From Swiss-Prot:
CDD domains given in the database record: ABC_NrtD_SsuB_transporters
Ranges of residues in domain ABC transporter: 9-227
Coiled coil segments of this chain: none
Stated family: Belongs to the ABC transporter superfamily. Aliphatic sulfonates importer (TC 3.A.1.17.2) family.
UniProt-listed Gene3D superfamilies: P-loop containing nucleotide triphosphate hydrolases
EC code: 7.6.2.14
One GO MF term attached to the UniProt entry: ATP hydrolysis activity
Protein name: Aliphatic sulfonates import ATP-binding protein SsuB 1
């Protein structure tokens, strides 16, 4: 996707209620075209709900989501979840092409990009958890989304596979820039991947940390370590506040 066609987002007054429970409180947020933004926060504050609202899978109780930049053809987003959601009765290539037509060559290119060249005829049951998530990433990218929405996509993976997937995502985005929103419980993951890290609590967005470091980032960097401690402290305070309600 050419840099000039990148899409940004404006969230204005987004609020959401489930019956008598409010999970999002008047969220105002501007995401610049091509920006990578991560959301941290305690469970139950609406992080995944916010992604679903941006994707159009849920409607906010109030507020609007608007796109900025790009072309006039509308904004298309794709979500990638913690569960790979592959169809077990379809092979790898068919899973990548799901919902599209005449995309075989592009699907094969993406499987190469994610390190699964030659595995297109395999069944999901023949793949490891990390490999299945690679297929899910290729499937999301095949649709060439303006906005890639990642809901804890690596949360179920072991530590080594998680780092490998983070590095893969970095490489793919370096070659195919796009706007990305990530929900994660892994503070280090957010700091390594993101341009901005937002702390979402029951009070709304209480921290907006901008990371000026170039990528790839060294995980032992002293400044990243200091930010990690700061964010962990904020998460602990937010979790304690929720527990006391």
């Amino acid at each position: 996707m050419p840099a000039t066609n990148l899409v940004g987002l404006d969230l204005v007054g987004i609020g959401h209620r489930y019956r008598d429970t409010t999970v999002l409180h008047d969220i105002d947020l501007t995401v610049e075209p091509g920006e990578f933004v991560s959301f941290l926060g305690p469970s139950g504050v609406g992080k995944s709900t916010l992604l679903r609202i941006i994707a159009g899978l849920e409607q906010p109780t109030h507020g609007v989501v608007e796109s900025t930049g790009g072309t006039s053809g509308g904004t298309m987003s794709r979500m990638m979840f913690q569960e790979d959601r592959l169809l077990p009765w379809r092979n790898v290539l068919d899973n990548v092409q799901l919902g599209t037509r005449h995309q075989r060559e592009r699907a094969l290119e993406l499987l190469y990009d994610v390190g699964l060249a030659g595995r297109e005829k395999d069944w999901p049951s023949e793949l490891s958890g990390g490999q299945r998530q690679r297929v899910a990433l290729a499937r999301a990218l095949l649709h060439q989304p303006d906005v890639l929405l990642l809901d804890e996509p690596f949360g179920a993976l072991d530590a080594i596979t998680r780092v490998a997937m983070q590095q893969l995502l970095e490489r793919v985005l370096a070659e195919q820039p796009r706007t990305v929103l990530l929900v994660t419980h892994d503070v280090e993951e957010a700091l390594v991947l993101s341009d901005r890290v937002l702390l979402l609590t029951d009070q709304g967005i209480t921290r907006d940390l901008r990371i000026p470091h170039a990528r790839p980032r060294h995980r032992g960097d002293a400044q990243l370590a200091a930010w990690k401690e700061e964010l962990l402290d904020g998460l602990l305070q937010a979790d304690n506040a929720l527990s006391s309600l």
